[in-house]
């Protein structure tokens, strides 16, 4: 999957919890001219200069198609995206599934469009294992070791843990009630490499992670999986409250018209996606439910 979904640091959860604490994120929205360009925030995922260049090309296309002046801005970190939307320092943002739930809850944002990647608007998470270890079912992982990605990663922790909890394999949200040991690898690639090199018995990651991160067919052939989650809605673009409905409609029409093959190079540059489809807040209710089960909803 393109990298604005790959890893969502736990800091974004903590930052969202802190938004209502005096002194945290309490700066007023900056004054802006009526004709000032809208700002699209890009979630940090790779070299900032390269991402900024891709973002600039992307918003030029949006402006041309919609007539709405736009600019792109690479966020310093994931937590900063939610806070920038809340304080109206940015107007739209690429967001992860968990990031959207937080932006909706903390900033009142609404989802505008949903990404299409590999022809799909959803993905799954899996527990990957080496095929030569004789592990066939989730139950076979009892007493084994596992690599997760990050405590706030949808496919690298939250959804895999919910799968284990719903099957009665994990108790009290503690992976060590089922696994001998559990670690956070930090990235999806690192989690897969830990399996390949025998440092752990299993790794949690998204459905296309081996093809995206291992690349070598010989390595991919060594990896199988023993459990798969329900679908997770794709990432997308959200818009903050206060952007006029007429403007939002123009932007949505423009975004839905950006698709392959005409815009294939542009879409690959920005986040390696195929285009966008209609989205609805209800699409992300399963993410809210999973976060609730994992006790990751910040208090009101």
Q: For each predicted feature, which ranges?
A:
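Periplasmic-binding protein-like
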Residues: 36-45, 51, 116-129, 214-258, ...
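A ligand-binding cleft/hinge motif common to bilobed small-molecule-binding domains
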Residues: 94-106, 160-166, 194-221
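N-terminal hydrophobic or amphipathic helices and topogenic motifs
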Residues: 2-7, 11-80, 88, 265-300
